[in-house]
């Protein structure tokens, strides 16, 4: 996104990468993409009792251009999938995605043609959060695991190429569940 992509690979020391990772993980700005009942638990996590501000997430961003984390909470319909992808494409790099709830991760109990059977077919997902709906403590644990992933992410020329390859691999992956039952 900036100067770190212009540096040759191997130029940055690990301590500088660790410092940059600490800065990135301490200032993650989430964008809400609440689509169903999981969004209620996501809003609860942002309230005073759970206090996401101590993790650097003061407020959920209303614009994708100001966010670097998308929390997809709930089922995604086929008509909503292009909108989800457009919002993801508008986010600046580096960007991360948490798939919150079983509906976002695999379609959940909505095993039909109208629901995307896993949001990972639309955008690359970094953390899967199971549950129907997951508790706020589980979302906080997923955020902490994402912080660990951000802390260990590399900088430099190879970072953008690695992100592109990971996105292509995620979008070409086989479905996470098999359509069966009355529909097939």
Swiss-Prot record:
It is a peripheral membrane protein. GO terms for molecular function: 4 iron, 4 sulfur cluster binding; iron ion binding; NADH dehydrogenase (ubiquinone) activity; NADH:ubiquinone reductase (non-electrogenic) activity; quinone binding. It catalyses: a quinone + NADH + 5 H(+)(in) = a quinol + NAD(+) + 4 H(+)(out). It is an enzyme of class 7 (translocase). Its cofactor is [4Fe-4S] cluster. Its EC number is 7.1.1.-. Binds 1 [4Fe-4S] cluster. The keyword Transmembrane helix does not apply. GO terms for cellular component: plasma membrane; respiratory chain complex I. Keywords: 4Fe-4S, Cell membrane, Iron, Iron-sulfur, Membrane, Metal-binding, NAD, Quinone, Translocase, Transport. It is found in: Cell membrane. The keyword Calcium does not apply. [4Fe-4S] cluster binds at residues 37-38, 103, 132. PROSITE patterns: COMPLEX1_20K (PS01150). SUPFAM superfamilies: HydA/Nqo6-like. GO terms for biological process: aerobic respiration; electron transport coupled proton transport. NDH-1 is composed of 14 different subunits. Subunits NuoB, C, D, E, F, and G constitute the peripheral sector of the complex. Belongs to the complex I 20 kDa subunit family. NDH-1 shuttles electrons from NADH, via FMN and iron-sulfur (Fe-S) centers, to quinones in the respiratory chain. The immediate electron acceptor for the enzyme in this species is believed to be a menaquinone. Couples the redox reaction to proton translocation (for every two electrons transferred, four hydrogen ions are translocated across the cytoplasmic membrane), and thus conserves the redox energy in a proton gradient. HAMAP family: NDH1_NuoB. This is NADH-quinone oxidoreductase subunit B 1. It comes from Streptomyces coelicolor (strain ATCC BAA-471 / A3(2) / M145).
